[in-house]
UniProtKB/Swiss-Prot annotation:
This is Outer membrane protein assembly factor BamA. Residues 1-20 form the signal peptide. InterPro entries: Bac_surfAg_D15, BamA/TamA_POTRA, D15-like, OM_assembly_BamA, POTRA. GO terms for biological process: Gram-negative-bacterium-type cell outer membrane assembly; protein insertion into membrane. It is found in: Cell outer membrane. One of its GO terms (cellular component) is Bam protein complex. The keyword Signal applies. Part of the Bam complex, which is composed of the outer membrane protein BamA, and four lipoproteins BamB, BamC, BamD and BamE. NCBIfam families: OM_YaeT, PRK11067.1. The keyword Protease does not apply.
Amino acid sequence: MAMKKLLIASLLLSSATVYGADGFVVKDIHFDGLQRVAVGAALLSMPVRVGDTVSDEDLSNTIRALFATGNFEDVQVLRDGNTLIVQVKERPTIASITFSGNKAVKEDMLKQNLEASGVRVGEALDRTTVSTIEKGLEDFYYSVGKYSASVKAVVTPLPRNRVDLKLVFTEGVSAKIQQINVVGNKAFSSDELISRFQLRDDVPWWNVVGDRKYQKQKLAGDLETLRSFYLDRGYARFNIDSTQVSLTPDKKGIYITVNITEGEQYKLSGVAVSGNLAGHSAEIEGLSKVKPGELYNGAKVTRTEDDIKKLLGRYGYAYPRVQTQTEIDDANKTVKLHINVDAGNRYYVRKVRFEGNDTSKDAVLRREMRQMEGAWLGSDLVEQGKDRLNRIGYFETVDTDTVRVPGSADQVDVVYKVKERNTGTLNFGVGYGTESGVSFQAGITQENWLGTGNTVGISGTKNDYQTYAEFSLTDPYFTVDGVSLGGRLFYNNFKADDADLSDYTNKSYGLDGTLGFPVNENNTLRVGLGYVHNSLSNMQPQVAMWRYLRSVGMNPSLSSNEDFSTDDFTFNYGWTYNTLDRGFFPTAGNRTNLNGKVTIPGSDNAFYKATLDTQQYVPLDQDHSWVLLGRGRVGYADGLSGKELPFYENFYAGGSSTVRGFRSNTIGPKAAYYNNGSSNCSGSDVAKICSSDDAVGGNAMAVASAELITPTPFLSEKYANSVRTSLFVDAGTVWDTHWDDTAATLGAGVPDYSKPGNIRMSAGLALQWMSPLGPLVFSYAQPFKKYDGDKAEQFQFNIGKTW
């Protein structure tokens, strides 16, 4: 024991050796061992100065002060007469930092953590800090189930008291959950409870959410899910007594045991609201989601608290406090809720500010605002502004923040933080298709031209059956009241016979203009005028086509092709109802469009045409990761004043935007030709009718789709807002209400195309990607209900189309 005490004393003396117990006056200070640290910097860190009278305690404080700088591994203070000699050993300087073997932890994250701990190139190496970092990283690996992981800091000495620091990772494998046990449950089976966990001991192949890899954070979330499950079903005394996580000897397997006490179900005996209600007591009391006599429900209590905060927020109370205390009567198995409300101060809005809009001008964002500066704060108005910014589609994300104004008790700034997305689409391509042959396409569309909010588009397509060019321009705020103005010029040379449609060629050009009038937050009315010139040629004698020509006063030959041209002026109208939460990749809300046109006097044709589209997004979970999408489209058109609808105005279905899995525009009525020499013909030589597989379209259409939008497997959260996957079922039909089912067409095997019941159906999966070149859509679908003459196309790819 005496030897041990002597050893401890000698160790203490080794760091500070001073001769003489009495104080003395310091006349000089010398340093021995300084290399990187300047003498002046070392002197400034010492509490002792030349001329001071110092004691042993002062010298001990000097040693502690020098150690505290982090620059020294060893410090000794010696006395030579009235001179202090400070002998130091500097910590080595870090020359470089490298990493090896790290896969689960990215280098950027490691560098940030090292920087935060003061470990960086050019600084002194603190071995204690490095040891702490080693342990912290190992603890992180343990928290994600990698119990065999290790992290070692390798320090390599270099000349001039420098070192290389290398962190060597051995990550190992993640421990798999072998079994999860819930002990103490009586009302619900263990399988039912565990099915609500993210962590699983058995994961079916189709479950993209469940995970057998242990993670401490996920377990904590699952325990909270378990707690909420019971509290939402009346078990007010539910408790998680303990949780055991056991590791197998090889550190590759984990057993989890959760011990619970369910308790009994409790009913509500009453709800009492008190506190500073800011004069809105009647409204607040009416918000309660819980009623006496029903089972206690924790989720309803939380929703009630949130609704009270939202209500007060609408009246300018930006920071209300709402707390609910439960008064539990164990004898009667009842719970009384005491909701205490403190509305706090009412706030004005000093400024509305925007952050992150590097391209979009402030005015483009500000015109979407409903919260005015200088007015009372209204949380609903702030939220409306957020919804409108999301809906215009210029931003990936929009977040809001209400910030108190320093020095003011009743003013706040409302800050909208946006992350802009690429709103321009530039594409140029050369391709080859079995239908189109060699294809050239080019286009540029900018939805937010120069940050003004205007949309400008120029596009063109050239292939075996079409030459198309278009220029369009839309100003969504032509007036300050939100009246929009849009216009379009186009040219189209279309050879229908080369596109699996009935035989004709149409060279058309035209223009149109549209004014849009906002009716309210969600409704817009559009009106406009249009003009189009159609020059039709090489029209092969065909039953539906010839029926139209006769209606406009022509007497076409049954044995030769015809040419025809028209000039039409139209009144265009439309209505849009939009409650979608975002302009692209929405997850909630509805968008319904009604579009139509009718010819006006001066036109060669007389007809009307209308289409109704609707999309409904229903989120299935709180995070909007799973969303049900229902889509529908119906269209109808007909002639006026005894004239028929022009055949080139018919509806078509099939393709990536209607019924996937079928070739574009091939669903519906097929052409029946006169005297085309086909083997499928019937009738006399003069009026012989021949069936075909060429699509001709119809004057009525109905399309529907049910789609389940799912989280994209194996995709980083970073890309969650730019990639979408879904499973779908599509259905659709096109028919001709004026089809004349004659004996001749029956003899040629031509079906009755006036029936709407010939519905085609398909099922498949789709992937959408908001790429730097614009939206890309891939789909694979398998038709499971089709008819003779239909043309399948399982894999389809489209650029620049989203829904």
